[in-house]
């Protein structure tokens, strides 16, 4: 089962993005020919979801490298560093963004050696400089495209491991969108649901709308309908009542950053669901690639939380819904403590509490 749309792709020296701001009303694509357009798309949620942001950042960096100056290796190197810095500042919470920037920097370091050094230098003759920089650009584009291909394969492995947790007939609650729209393809949390369906299991999805930007209503419901997966849309405030009624068998969410103790930053409202799930003995599963795990962080207290514009709460699709001048607090994410999470599903297998040891075992076991 594969999605009938493309979230992100490299086409003819440009980055093709499905405009998720236009969904569900219109399925349209943006062709970004300048890296600034990719940056804007990341910031304004045209492309969103941690894995998709990572791939978009890599492609944006590769795109920007195509127009870096050829005057000297030093100018090229300085321009590349500035380019990476711009993308690293695009959104602060998504670990995959920083992972992608770091990986593109490594690729650059491996191929940028005009004078047999990875340091910025202007020592090489003109023609040799041009050949070297052309090779660097080619390598960066290839790396970004490789990351997109790897992401789809990783998501399929997440689905393979995660679907064993899903029994036939399960009723699954989702939050935000962690599907093909949030990745280069297939999805993390929705990838588990796809894999369960491919294994012949029947499932029913309850998608909560996910205020304030309505990713559940606009994106998850749209994506599941495209796949003919049964989905029922609910408001965020209905989730607890469904659990009380015994109508939810498990909760499946993605993640934007995970600390080594399992504390998980995900779309605002995830923590609320986790507390409700614990009160009703409903398992909550997090599906995310290993690249989302920040091994430098010992707990979720260290995860930076992005705050979004007030307009996201004050308006819906441009229509005001609150009195002018009211104060607004709009964190994009919250952090769910690891002890509320029943399992973290990765491409290397499933980790369970306590996560410090189980996640480390997955890292050690995976190439």
Curated annotation (Swiss-Prot):
Substrate binds at residues 48-50, 91, 215, 266-267. Keywords: Amino-acid biosynthesis, Isomerase, Methionine biosynthesis. Gene3D superfamilies: translation initiation factor eif-2b, domain 1, Translation initiation factor eif-2b, domain 2. SUPFAM superfamilies: NagB/RpiA/CoA transferase-like (SSF100950). Pathway: Amino-acid biosynthesis; L-methionine biosynthesis via salvage pathway; L-methionine from S-methyl-5-thio-alpha-D-ribose 1-phosphate: step 1/6. GO terms for molecular function: S-methyl-5-thioribose-1-phosphate isomerase activity. Pfam families: IF-2B. One of its GO terms (biological process) is L-methionine salvage from methylthioadenosine. It catalyses: 5-(methylsulfanyl)-alpha-D-ribose 1-phosphate = 5-(methylsulfanyl)-D-ribulose 1-phosphate. The record marks 176 as: Transition state stabilizer. InterPro entries: IF-2B-related, IF-M1Pi, IF_2B-like_C, Initiation_fac_2B_a/b/d, M1Pi_N, NagB/RpiA_transferase-like. The active site is at residue 256. Its EC number is 5.3.1.23. Catalyzes the interconversion of methylthioribose-1-phosphate (MTR-1-P) into methylthioribulose-1-phosphate (MTRu-1-P). Belongs to the eIF-2B alpha/beta/delta subunits family. MtnA subfamily. This is Methylthioribose-1-phosphate isomerase. It comes from Syntrophus aciditrophicus (strain SB). The gene is mtnA.
């Amino acid at each position: 089962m594969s999605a009938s749309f493309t979230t992100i792709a490299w086409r003819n020296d440009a980055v093709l993005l499905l405009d998720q701001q236009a969904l569900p009303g219109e399925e349209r694509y943006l062709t970004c020919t300048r890296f600034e357009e990719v940056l804007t798309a990341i910031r304004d949620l045209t492309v969103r979801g941690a894995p998709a942001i990572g791939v978009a950042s890599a492609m944006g960096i590769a795109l920007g490298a195509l127009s870096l100056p050829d005057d000297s290796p030093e100018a090229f190197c300085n321009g590349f560093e500035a380019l990476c810095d711009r993308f690293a500042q695009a959104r602060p919470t998504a670990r995959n963004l920083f992972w992608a920037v770091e990986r593109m920097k490594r690729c650059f370091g491996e191929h940028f050696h005009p004078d047999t050094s990875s340091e910025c230098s202007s020592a090489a003759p003109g023609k040799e400089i041009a050949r070297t920089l052309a090779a660097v650009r080619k390598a960066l584009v290839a790396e970004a495209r490789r990351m997109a291909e790897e992401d789809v394969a990783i998501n399929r492995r997440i689905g393979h491991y995660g679907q064993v947790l899903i029994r036939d007939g399960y009723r699954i609650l989702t939050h935000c969108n962690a599907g093909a729209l949030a990745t280069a393809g297939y999805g993390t949390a929705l990838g588990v649901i796809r894999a369960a369906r491919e294994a012949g299991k029947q499932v029913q999805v309850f998608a909560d709308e996910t205020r304030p930007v309505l990713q559940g209503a606009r994106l998850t419901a749209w994506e599941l309908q495209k796949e003919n997966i049964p989905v029922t849309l609910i408001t965020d405030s209905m989730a607890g009542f469904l659990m009380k009624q015994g109508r939810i068998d498990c909760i499946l969410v993605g993640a934007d950053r995970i600390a080594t103790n399992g504390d998980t930053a995900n779309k605002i409202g995830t923590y609320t669901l986790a507390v409700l799930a614990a009160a009703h003995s409903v398992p909550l599963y997090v599906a995310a690639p290993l690249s989302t795990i920040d091994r430098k962080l010992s707990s979720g207290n260290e995860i930076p939380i992005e705050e979004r514009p007030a307009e996201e709460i004050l308006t819906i699709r441009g229509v005001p819904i609150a009195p002018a001048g009211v104060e607004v607090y709009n964190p994009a994410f919250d952090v769910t403590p690891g002890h509320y999470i029943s399992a973290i599903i990765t491409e290397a297998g499933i980790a369970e509490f306590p996560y410090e040891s189980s996640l480390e075992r997955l890292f050690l076991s995976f190439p």
